């Protein structure tokens, strides 16, 4: 047992210049854990709720109210508890809030404490965070999903789909996969320059050119893979995050200036998958369109990975409903969608028990905190999504995975 001695939080800035919370936990043996909470741009309706200040400062996005909750009521509740009992600490914060979405004290307040406690406990034992959270079975480095062209809510351009990604499968080591993806990214930059497109980047480091439709980014990425010296489909596959809830009006989807039904949009996906080596589609339909998701799952569920992000919001109860209804076959894992380390772990375990793949994920508003890199290895998620290799808050996660590779070199690669 090691007792939580002190908890404190301050306001810092995330990668978009918005305020967020940095939390520090000190244990009675002198061990310290710190964590910075991320924040999303496109968010699911059923996510745990961040607490923001409102008012004029930072356009209403300040987090001083949440920080006050950390420094007062959460600190009073958690100090004196055993840091090694993560679930008891997380359960205590959930009970303190009294709601199922942290609308009282703020999911951002809770998550910062939860992450920092885990770090402090790992430091107390002098073991890596991934080993502390995952035990002896934490041994596999995830296949990264690199977001290299941005559209939708992550960029100010004409592309509807939010993310166009590459996944380097055909490599024996994580470091080799990272190198390949980086070379494709740099090649893509040159191609876009040669075509006269902007190489300005979006929130997650991907380029955000004004392209004519949602297929053109795929064509350009295919060209970049080949020009970089790699084989599409064999070594590097494609993935899409459509973020279709942003395109849905309750009945139809606004795609390239046209209104499409769920069936018509699914047919588009089928054609794209027939034409290109697409491994994964995330949020292919709206979180409110479960009938459409059923159609998508029936048509493509046995061929590609269908990831629920806004659909499941890392929520164990919602995922259970999806499993029962045969919706999707994978889940995006974002700790701040659900609010604590323990709740995140419970959702991952439910998914894995039922054959759903898990993708550990960043948010568009990130920081230098690399917690999710360790978390992906700890939970053997097999995949991680944390942006392009061009912004330091994204590279912090990749660099941490490179460090972990020195200790546990198994890479999922083409075994996924």
From Swiss-Prot:
Reaction equations catalysed: (2R)-2-phosphoglycerate = phosphoenolpyruvate + H2O
Domain of life: Bacteria
Positions with a binding annotation for Mg(2+): 241, 282, 309
Cofactor: record remark: Binds a second Mg(2+) ion via substrate during catalysis.
Coiled-coil intervals: none
Active site: 204 (proton donor), 334 (proton acceptor)
Keyword Lipid metabolism: no
GO biological process: glycolytic process
Pathway entry: Carbohydrate degradation; glycolysis; pyruvate from D-glyceraldehyde 3-phosphate: step 4/5
A Gene Ontology term for the protein's cellular component: phosphopyruvate hydratase complex
A molecular function (GO) term: phosphopyruvate hydratase activity
Cofactor: Mg(2+)
Positions contributing to (2R)-2-phosphoglycerate binding: 162, 334, 363-364, 385
Family: Belongs to the enolase family.
Protein task: Catalyzes the reversible conversion of 2-phosphoglycerate (2-PG) into phosphoenolpyruvate (PEP). It is essential for the degradation of carbohydrates via glycolysis.
Protein's UniProt name: Enolase
Name of the gene this protein is made from: eno
């Amino acid at each position: 047992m090691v007792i939580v001695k002190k908890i404190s939080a301050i306001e810092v800035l995330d990668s978009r210049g918005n305020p967020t919370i940095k939390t520090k936990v000190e244990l009675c043996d002198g061990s310290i854990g710190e964590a910075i909470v991320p924040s999303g741009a496109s968010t699911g309706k059923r996510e745990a709720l961040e607490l923001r200040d409102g008012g004029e400062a930072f356009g209403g996005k300040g987090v001083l109210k949440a920080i006050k909750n950390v420094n007062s009521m959460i600190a009073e509740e958690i100090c004196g508890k055993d840091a090694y009992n993560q679930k008891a600490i997380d359960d205590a914060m959930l009970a303190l809030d009294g709601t199922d979405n942290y609308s009282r004290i703020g999911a951002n307040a809770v998550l910062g404490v939860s992450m920092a406690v885990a770090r402090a406990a790992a430091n107390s034992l002098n073991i890596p965070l991934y080993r502390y959270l995952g035990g002896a079975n934490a041994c596999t480095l995830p296949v990264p999903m690199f977001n290299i062209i941005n559209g939708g809510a992550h960029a100010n351009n004409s592309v509807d789909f939010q993310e166009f990604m590459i996944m380097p499968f055909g490599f024996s080591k994580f470091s080799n996969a990272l190198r390949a993806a980086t070379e494709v990214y740099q090649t893509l930059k040159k191609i876009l320059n040669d075509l006269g497109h902007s190489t300005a980047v979006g929130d997650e480091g991907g380029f955000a050119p004004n392209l004519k439709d949602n297929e053109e980014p795929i064509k350009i990425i295919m060209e970049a893979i080949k020009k970089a010296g790699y084989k599409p489909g064999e070594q590097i596959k494609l993935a899409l995050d459509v973020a279709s809830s942003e395109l849905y009006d309750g009945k139809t989807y606004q795609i390239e200036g046209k209104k499409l039904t769920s069936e018509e949009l699914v047919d588009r996906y089928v054609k794209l998958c027939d034409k290109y080596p697409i491994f994964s589609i995330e949020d292919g339909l709206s979180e409110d369109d479960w009938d459409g998701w059923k159609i998508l799952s029936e048509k493509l569920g046995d061929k590609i990975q269908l990831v629920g992000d806004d659909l499941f919001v890392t929520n164990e109860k919602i995922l259970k409903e999806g499993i029962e209804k045969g919706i999707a076959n994978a889940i995006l894992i974002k700790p701040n969608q659900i609010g604590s380390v323990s709740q995140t772990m419970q959702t991952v375990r439910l998914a894995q028990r039922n054959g759903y793949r898990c993708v550990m994920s960043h948010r568009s508003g990130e920081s230098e905190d690399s917690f999710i890199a360790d978390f992906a290895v700890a939970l053997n998620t097999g995949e991680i999504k944390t942006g392009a290799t061009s912004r330091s808050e994204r590279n912090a996660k990749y660099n941490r995975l490179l460090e972990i590779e020195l200790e546990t070199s198994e890479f999922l690669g083409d075994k996924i």
